[in-house]
C-alpha cells in the first residue's frame, strides 16, 4: 500500500518535471534569442529590458516563494489543479535558467560563424537558425540535462501547495 502511494507521487513529480521542462525550454529559448539579438546588434531594447527584469526576479527569488505566489496569489480565485499550478511555476522558473544557459551557448559561438552566414547571403534569422543555434545546442546540451535534474529535485517542494499550516 505504501509503495503504491509512493509510485503515484513519483509519477506526479515526473509529470510535473516533464511539462515544466517543456515550458521552460520554450520560454528559455525565446528569452535567450531576444537577449542574444540585443547583445549582438542592439535591437529589441524594450523586450530585452523585460527579459532582464524577468531573469533578475525569477533567478533572485526562492522557488518555494514563487510556487506560493503562483498558487495563493495568481491562481487564488481560480479553481485549477495543483499540478497545473506547479507546472506553471516550475516552468517559469526553469525558463529563466534555460535562457541563460542557451544565451551563453549562443555567445560561445565564434563571431566568424556569424560572418560566415552573412557571407553566404543569410539574414540574421537564417544565420541563427541554420548556423548558430545547431552549434549552440550541442554546446548547451549537458547544462540543459543538469537543469532537468535540478528541476526534478525541486519539484519535491510542490507538495507544499495546499499545506496551509506552513503559510500561517
List the predicted regions and their residue ranges.
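Transmembrane-helix boundary motif in ABC transporter permease subunits
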Residues: 19-55
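Generic hydrophobic transmembrane alpha-helix motif, especially the helices
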Residues: 58-86, 160
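Single conserved hydrophobic/aromatic residue that forms the stacking wall/gate
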Residues: 1-6
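Glycine-rich helix-loop "coupling/hinge" segments at transmembrane-helix boundaries
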Residues: 77, 151-168
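Transmembrane alpha-helices
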Residues: 122-158
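Active-site loops and adjacent core secondary-structure elements that bind or stabilize anionic groups
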Residues: 9
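Short helix-to-coil transition segments within interhelical loops
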Residues: 61, 106-126, 130-136
Amino acid at each position: 500500500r505504501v509503495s503504491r502511494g509512493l509510485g503515484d507521487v513519483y509519477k506526479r513529480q515526473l509529470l510535473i518535471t516533464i511539462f515544466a521542462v517543456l515550458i521552460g525550454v520554450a520560454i528559455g529559448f525565446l528569452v535567450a534569442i531576444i537577449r542574444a539579438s540585443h547583445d549582438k546588434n542592439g535591437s529589441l531594447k524594450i523586450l530585452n529590458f523585460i527579459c532582464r527584469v524577468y531573469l533578475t526576479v525569477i533567478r533572485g527569488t526562492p522557488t518555494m516563494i514563487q510556487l506560493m505566489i503562483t498558487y495563493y496569489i495568481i491562481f487564488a480565485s481560480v479553481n485549477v489543479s495543483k499540478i497545473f499550478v506547479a507546472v506553471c511555476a516550475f516552468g517559469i522558473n526553469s525558463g529563466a535558467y534555460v535562457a541563460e544557459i542557451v544565451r551563453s551557448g549562443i555567445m560561445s559561438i565564434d563571431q566568424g560563424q556569424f560572418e560566415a552566414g552573412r557571407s553566404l547571403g543569410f539574414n540574421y534569422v537564417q544565420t541563427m537558425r541554420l548556423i548558430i543555434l545547431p552549434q549552440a545546442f550541442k554546446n548547451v546540451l549537458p547544462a540543459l540535462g543538469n537543469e532537468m535534474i535540478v528541476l526534478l529535485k525541486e519539484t519535491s517542494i510542490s507538495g507544499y501547495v495546499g499545506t496551509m499550516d506552513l503559510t500561517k
